């Protein structure tokens, strides 16, 4: 019988906290939530589309949470500005960690957390939300195998139409606006396809029509690399919403086009693949690849963390990739 991991869920304020706690409720064979730390007395900006449900769990103060030493893993789900402060505490203690994103408005605090986890040999999993996406994994493996040749362009968007006026103002509380908050998910994905250091980054930061000047809810960023380009964008007033989000990757021998990026309406997630040459059982031409029916955005990633902590699989963290993703994210603040 596999060990259930004693789990501290630190924070209720992150936008993903309601979804993460809901996923953990389903994974009782892997995780035993011993406490939820209530961070709501803090004043850091935050926004929730869904309420946080701590029913059935012991809710403790932050000071009480920090006194708890007998835990196997911590989920850091505070407001964005507080993530690295809490992550550093548990990295220094050598506790396995899932920490949500983004990783702060500077590189230094995040690099310190990474260095501590490396030195102590404990897992640090960042909550970029497409890491367990089956279509993204298919693309990553196919690109690595050379199916679509050398990558020349990659683009993605995280447009949406949810959130009231307070959400629009929330985007203005971040130096990098909506794209700092959401674009890091896209950069985590696209950086797997476009390698190297950008020679130039052009960022457009604006507001949707009718919104006030303090709002940063219409943004794009164009990254130029030797031999390739990358484009990410996000607007919170795009009526197509989540079901029109897209990732497209163009190579010298083919293209991947994923739209929507994810879906939880019971329908199949489908990836369009166009090949110039036959590969591994696929003929040249256009293919619609079924990636199955998604039921949970986060479960796959955090189940993997449980297996790593128990020693069932090797640690899958690629710290150099993660540091590069954060460096690309910080370009949005310039």
Regions picked out by a protein language model, each given a short descriptive name:
Residues 50-116:
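Beta-loop-alpha module in the N-terminal Rossmann-like domain of NAD(P)-dependent dehydrogenases
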Residues 3, 181, 187-265, 292, ...:
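Contiguous beta-strand/loop segments that form the cofactor/metal-binding neighborhood of enzyme cores
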Residues 130-212:
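Predominantly a Rossmann-like dinucleotide-binding segment in NAD(P)-dependent oxidoreductases
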Residues 1-4, 37, 73-75, 300-334:
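C-terminal helix-rich "cap/oligomerization" subdomain common to oxidoreductases
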Residues 112-130, 150-154:
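Rossmann-fold dehydrogenase core element
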Residues 15, 41-43, 240, 289-303, ...:
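Active-site loop of classical SDR/Rossmann-like NAD(P)-dependent oxidoreductases
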Residues 1-53, 306:
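N-terminal Rossmann-like dinucleotide-binding module
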């Amino acid at each position: 019988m596999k060990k259930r991991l004693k789990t501290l869920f630190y924070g209720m304020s992150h936008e993903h906290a309601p979804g993460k706690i809901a996923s953990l409720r389903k994974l009782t064979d892997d995780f035993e939530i011993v406490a939820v730390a209530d961070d709501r007395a803090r004043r850091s900006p935050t926004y929730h589309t869904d309420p946080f449900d701590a029913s059935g769990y012991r809710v403790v103060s932050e000071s009480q949470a920090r006194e708890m030493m007998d835990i196997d893993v911590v989920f850091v789900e505070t407001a964005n500005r507080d993530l690295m402060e809490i992550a550093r505490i548990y990295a220094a203690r050598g506790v396995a960690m899932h920490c949500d994103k983004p990783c702060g408005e500077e590189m230094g605090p995040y690099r310190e957390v990474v260095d501590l986890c490396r030195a102590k040999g404990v897992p640090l999993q960042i909550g970029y939300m497409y890491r367990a996406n089956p279509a993204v994994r298919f693309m990553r493996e196919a690109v690595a195998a050379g199916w679509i040749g050398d990558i020349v362009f990659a683009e993605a968007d995280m447009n949406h139409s949810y959130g009231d006026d307070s959400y629009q103002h929330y985007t203005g509380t971040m130096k990098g606006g909506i794209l700092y908050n959401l674009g890091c998910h896209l950069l985590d994905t696209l950086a797997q396809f476009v390698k190297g250091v950008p020679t130039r980054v052009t960022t457009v930061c604006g507001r949707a029509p009718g919104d006030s000047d303090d709002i940063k809810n219409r943004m794009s960023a164009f990254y130029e690399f030797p031999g390739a380009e990358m484009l990410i964008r996000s607007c919170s007033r795009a009526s197509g919403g989540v079901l029109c989000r897209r990732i497209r990757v163009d190579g010298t021998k083919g293209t991947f086009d994923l739209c929507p990026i994810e879906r939880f309406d019971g329908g199949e997630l489908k990836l369009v693949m166009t090949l110039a040459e036959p590969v591994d059982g696929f003929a040249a031409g256009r293919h619609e690849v079924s990636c199955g029916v998604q039921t949970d955005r986060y479960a796959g990633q955090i189940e993997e963390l449980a297996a790593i902590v128990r020693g069932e699989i090797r640690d899958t963290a690629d710290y150099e990739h993660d540091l590069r993703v954060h460096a690309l994210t910080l370009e949005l603040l310039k």
